[in-house]
Amino acid sequence: QKKDKKDRFYGLF
């Protein structure tokens, strides 16, 4: 699984 900057950002939600 690759997590991009956006993925990490949305991960907070």
Swiss-Prot record:
The modification Pyrrolidone carboxylic acid is found at Q1. Coiled coil: none annotated. One of its GO terms (cellular component) is extracellular region. Signal peptide: none annotated. This is Tachykinin-like peptide-XIV. The keyword Secreted applies. It is found in: Secreted. Expressed by the venom gland. Its main location: secreted. Belongs to the tachykinin family. The modification Phenylalanine amide is found at F13. Keywords: Amidation, Pyrrolidone carboxylic acid, Secreted. The lineage of its organism: Eukaryota, Metazoa, Ecdysozoa, Arthropoda, Chelicerata. It comes from the Eukaryota.
